[in-house]
Amino acid sequence: MAIEIKAPTFPESVADGTVATWHKKPGEAVKRDELIVDIETDKVVIEVLAEADGVLAEIIKNEGDTVLSNELLGKLNEGGAAAPAAPAAAAPAAAPAAQAAAPAAAGGDDAILSPAARKLAEEAGIDPNSIAGTGKGGRVTKEDVVAAVEAKKNAPAAPAKPAAPAAEAPIFAAGDRVEKRVPMTRLRAKVAERLVEAQSAMAMLTTFNEVNMKPIMDLRSKYKDLFEKKHNGVRLGFMSFFVKAATEALKRFPGVNASIDGNDIVYHGYQDIGVAVSSDRGLVVPVLRNAEFMSLAEIEGGIANFGKKAKEGKLTIEDMTGGTFTISNGGVFGSLLSTPIVNPPQTAILGMHKIQERPMAVNGQVVILPMMYLALSYDHRLIDGKEAVSFLVAIKDLLEDPARLLLDV
């Protein structure tokens, strides 16, 4: 029985997809729940699995084709046998026996010479084995050597080797300056579209501050082993502290957690924090739902799970949809300072950066401290400068005195 292979049902936010990769060819056997084809959307790659054991009968939509929700991609013959493998080519006939050895040189490997002939040959620098003997039994006589010497004298001189041509300027091979044109992936095209949209539709501005990371680093160093043991291998990183600090600051400044819808301002009564994660396809932003209620361990576990799914290409559209505020950490790549771009319809994004030791003035003394620059990009249509600066200072204060996160002060 033929089974139709269809594209999945896309959410309302996804209009169509692109056939990225067929993992099977027509005639190949397929097992139930085995990956057949990948469909790339603006946000994620969706895997289409086989509904039953069988053989891939037909591919209707080829790689690179655009497909709609539930559109037919191909057909699977349930329970069919795979096409038989092509018979192996017949083994080549055995090579014929080697031909008889070429006749020996005129004088043989050990030519027979008279003492006088051998002495003359050595004086003339002639190999006796190269002289054809005319004596009895092929013996090389003195006359044979004399004849060989005369023949060598009368032989025309070898033409002189032509002088090497002057070196010419190097010529680049065609492949040294090759260009390759490939279509954008759907994710890259969507990112490009959204970034241009954000730049043109928002009154975007960035404010900066810096945070002393020593208190967080000391706390992490003191408890990281116990934390990992207590929470089944979940590692304590810096991102969880930033998420907790952000959720607390968002409670104090709800406008930073809001969005604009036409002429309305939508204040969200929840905090869904997007965390930028690097993947082979590019930067993706999965969302921690209701982050204000999550513990440090739950935040770290969620981020680690997102990172694993991103690496394996298994992030779902649900993982990537929504978000009321975003945190991006360019510091993991070595960025010292940047101006992150707001992801609409959100109105703000926090940028973390590289921790770097710098001399700082503390109580009149110069102290070397691990410092990090913070950047908050925001939509000035909704958020005033005072509110943005105060929000960033609140995050700074919470991170420099992490006990305040526990005491809610």
Curated annotation (Swiss-Prot):
<dbReference type="GO" id="GO:0006099">
    <property type="term" value="P:tricarboxylic acid cycle"/>
</dbReference>
<dbReference type="InterPro" id="IPR036625">
    <property type="entry name" value="E3-bd_dom_sf"/>
</dbReference>
<keyword id="KW-0012">Acyltransferase</keyword>
<dbReference type="InterPro" id="IPR006255">
    <property type="entry name" value="SucB"/>
</dbReference>
<comment type="subunit">
    <text>Forms a 24-polypeptide structural core with octahedral symmetry. Part of the 2-oxoglutarate dehydrogenase (OGDH) complex composed of E1 (2-oxoglutarate dehydrogenase), E2 (dihydrolipoamide succinyltransferase) and E3 (dihydrolipoamide dehydrogenase); the complex contains multiple copies of the three enzymatic components (E1, E2 and E3).</text>
</comment>
<dbReference type="InterPro" id="IPR000089">
    <property type="entry name" value="Biotin_lipoyl"/>
</dbReference>
<dbReference type="GO" id="GO:0004149">
    <property type="term" value="F:dihydrolipoyllysine-residue succinyltransferase activity"/>
</dbReference>
<keyword id="KW-0450">Lipoyl</keyword>
<comment type="similarity">
    <text>Belongs to the 2-oxoacid dehydrogenase family.</text>
</comment>
<dbReference type="GO" id="GO:0045252">
    <property type="term" value="C:oxoglutarate dehydrogenase complex"/>
</dbReference>
<feature type="domain" description="Lipoyl-binding">
    <location>
        <begin position="2"/>
        <end position="77"/>
    </location>
</feature>
<dbReference type="InterPro" id="IPR050537">
    <property type="entry name" value="2-oxoacid_dehydrogenase"/>
</dbReference>
<feature type="domain" description="Peripheral subunit-binding (PSBD)">
    <location>
        <begin position="112"/>
        <end position="149"/>
    </location>
</feature>
<feature type="modified residue" description="N6-lipoyllysine">
    <location>
        <position position="43"/>
    </location>
</feature>
<dbReference type="GO" id="GO:0005829">
    <property type="term" value="C:cytosol"/>
</dbReference>
<dbReference type="InterPro" id="IPR001078">
    <property type="entry name" value="2-oxoacid_DH_actylTfrase"/>
</dbReference>
<dbReference type="InterPro" id="IPR011053">
    <property type="entry name" value="Single_hybrid_motif"/>
</dbReference>
<dbReference type="GO" id="GO:0033512">
    <property type="term" value="P:L-lysine catabolic process to acetyl-CoA via saccharopine"/>
</dbReference>
<protein>
    <recommendedName>
        <fullName>Dihydrolipoyllysine-residue succinyltransferase component of 2-oxoglutarate dehydrogenase complex</fullName>
        <ecNumber>2.3.1.61</ecNumber>
    </recommendedName>
</protein>
<feature type="active site">
    <location>
        <position position="380"/>
    </location>
</feature>
<dbReference type="Pfam" id="PF02817">
    <property type="entry name" value="E3_binding"/>
</dbReference>
<dbReference type="InterPro" id="IPR023213">
    <property type="entry name" value="CAT-like_dom_sf"/>
</dbReference>
<keyword id="KW-0816">Tricarboxylic acid cycle</keyword>
<keyword id="KW-0808">Transferase</keyword>
<dbReference type="InterPro" id="IPR004167">
    <property type="entry name" value="PSBD"/>
</dbReference>
<feature type="active site">
    <location>
        <position position="384"/>
    </location>
</feature>
<dbReference type="InterPro" id="IPR003016">
    <property type="entry name" value="2-oxoA_DH_lipoyl-BS"/>
</dbReference>
<comment type="function">
    <text>E2 component of the 2-oxoglutarate dehydrogenase (OGDH) complex which catalyzes the second step in the conversion of 2-oxoglutarate to succinyl-CoA and CO(2).</text>
</comment>
<dbReference type="Pfam" id="PF00198">
    <property type="entry name" value="2-oxoacid_dh"/>
</dbReference>
<dbReference type="Pfam" id="PF00364">
    <property type="entry name" value="Biotin_lipoyl"/>
</dbReference>
<comment type="pathway">
    <text>Amino-acid degradation; L-lysine degradation via saccharopine pathway; glutaryl-CoA from L-lysine: step 6/6.</text>
</comment>
